[in-house]
Swiss-Prot record:
Disruption phenotype: Mutants are viable and show no difference in body weight or locomotor activity. They are impaired in sensorimotor gating, spatial recognition memory and suppressed fear memory consolidation. Spine density of dentate gyrus granule neurons is significantly reduced compare to wild-type animals, which is associated with decreased spine width and increased spine length. Residues 58-86, 245-271, 316-332 have a biased composition (Polar residues). Glycosylated. Residues 132-160, 292-312 have a biased composition (Low complexity). The lineage of its organism: Eukaryota, Metazoa, Chordata, Craniata, Vertebrata. The chain crosses the membrane at residues 9-29, 468-488. It comes from Mus musculus. Keywords: Cell projection, Endosome, Glycoprotein, Membrane, Synapse, Transmembrane, Transmembrane helix. Residues 32-352, 364-417 are annotated as: Disordered. Residues 173-406 are annotated as: Interaction with DST (isoform 1). This is Transmembrane protein 108. Residues 489-574 are annotated as: Interaction with CYFIP2. Pfam families: TMEM108.
Amino acid sequence: MKRSLQALYCQLLSFLLTLALTKALVLAVHEPSPRESLQTLPSGSPPGTMVTAPHSPTRLSSVLTLNPTPDGPSSQAAATLETTVSHPEGHPPTDTTSTVMGTAAVPHPESPLPTGSPPAAMTTTPSHSESLPPGDATPTTTLPTKPAGTTSRPTVAPRATTRRPPRPPGSSRKGAGGSTRTLTPVPGGHLARKESQRGRNQSSAHLGPKRPLGKIFQIYKGNFTGSAEPDPSALTPRTPLGGYFSSTQPQTVSPATAPRSTSRVPPTTSLVPVKDKPGFIRSNQGSGPILTSPGGEPAATAATGAPASTQPAPVPSQSPHGDVQDSASHSDSWLAVTPDTDRPTSASSGVFTAATGPTQAAFDATVSAPSPGIPQGPSATPQAPTRPSGVSESTVSPAEEEAEASPTTTDRGPRPLSTVLSTATGNFLNRLVPAGTWKPGTVANISHVAEGDKPQHRATICLSKMDIAWVIVAISVPISSCSVLLTVCCMRRKKKTANPENNLSYWNNAITMDYFNRHAVELPREIQSLETSEDQLSEPRSPANGDYRDTGMVLVNPFCQETLFVGNDQVSEI
C-alpha cells in the first residue's frame, strides 16, 4: 500500500511539472507579435488610395495615392505620399518628425515652360538646426505646387490625419483651419524667402513649437499630412516615394542628376518655390531641366521622365532598412526623385526602378544615414549635385548620370544587409502593379505592402500542434521514468534490514544446544576407596542388575563436575 502511494505521488509531481512547462511554452509561442495591418478606405475615397496602418505604436505609416487623370494634350499623374504617426497615449512625443510627400512632373516637349511656379519645389524637415553656407544646396523632399483654383480630393488617413488642400503658386502652407496666406510673387529671392518663412511660421503653429525665425521652414512634430498635385499641363511619371526612413539622425538623399559642380549638403537649410526668372534654361531632349536662380544658388529642381505616350507603372516602395530600436525615435526623411529616361533597370539596395513600356523611367533615390555616434558635419553628409545657371541638361554624359545615380551609403548605421536586399529585390522590383488595377474600397494588389517590414520584426517561434505534443512527451517521459526508478530503489533499500535468523549457522548451533540440554549422557566410572582397594583388586565383582549400593562404585555425571560422594552406601544419581 505504501509503495503504491509513493509511486502515485511521484507521478503526480511529474505531471504537474510537465503541465507547468507546457503552459510556459504555449504562452511563449502564442505571444502576440507586432504585425502590420491593412485598412480599407470607404467608398468615397479617391481611386488608387492605399492606407497602411502602423505596425508599432510609434512607427510611421504610409498613405500612397495614385490619381491618373488625363487632360487634353497634356496629362498629369500625382503620386502623393502621406506619413502619419500614431501613439497609444493620444499625443505624439516631441522628438518625432515625419514629413515625406512629393510628385515629379514634366511638361510635354511641345508645350512651353509654365510661366507660374515651377512644377516642383524643394523643402526640408530637419530635426537639428545648423547654419548653411551661401553656396550649398540641399536635396530634400519634393513638394509639387499647383495653380490657384484647383482642389484636391480628400484622403482618409489613420488616426486624426488631415489632408491639406493644395496651395497656389507662391502661397504658404495651409493650416488645419483652412486659413490661407497668399503671397505675391516677388522677383527677389531674399524677399520671397522672408514671406514664405512668415507664412509657414503662422500656418504651422498648431503642429508643434516654433523654431527660431532664422530658418526657412519649421520642424513639424507629430502627425503631418500633405497633399499636392502638379501643374495640369505637365505629365507626371510617378512612383510612390519611400514610406519612411527611421533613424536617430537625419537622413539625406542626393538626387540622381549629373553635376558639373558639386557642393556639400548640410542637413538643415530648406529651399523655397522659385518664381519664373530669366535665368532658367530648359532642354527638350534632356532627362530634366535644372531650375536655378540668377545668383547661382540652386532653388528648385523639376523632375522629368517619360514622354506623354508612356503609361508609368507605380512601384509600391517601403523603407529598405530600419531598426526596431531606432523606429521609436527621430524619423526625418529627405528625399529627392529624379527620373532618367532610357535607362536599364538595376537592382540595388536603395535604388528603385520601374519599367514603363517602351521607355524606362528609373527613379533613383540614394539614402545616407549617419550613425548615432558621429556628429553631423561635412564629413557625414553626401555630395549633392548642383549646376550653375545657364547649363543645359543635354550636355551631361550618360556615364556621369550613372555614376551620380549610384547610392551613397557612407557613415551608414549598423543595419542588416539581408533585410535591405530582400526588401529591395522581393518587394520593389518583382512586384510591378499596373496603374489601372487599383480600385477604391478594395485591398487588391496591396497585400505585399505588409511583407516589406517583416524582416524588421524579431524572430518568432512558430510551432504546430504536433510539435507541442512532441515537446510535452519529451519532457514528461524522462521525469516520470526517473520518479518510478527512484521510488523502487528506496523501497528496496528499506526492506534490507539485519536479521540473524537468515543465517544457517545460527540454526545449527541452536539445535545442537537444545539436544544436549534435553538428553543427558551417563558415563560409567569406578571409584574405589582406600580400604577396599585391595579386596576389589583381588576379588573383582560387578553389581547384579545395576545395583551399586553395596559396592564401592560411584556414578559420575559428566555434566556436573566436582561432585563426588565417597561411601559404601551413598550413590550419586542423576
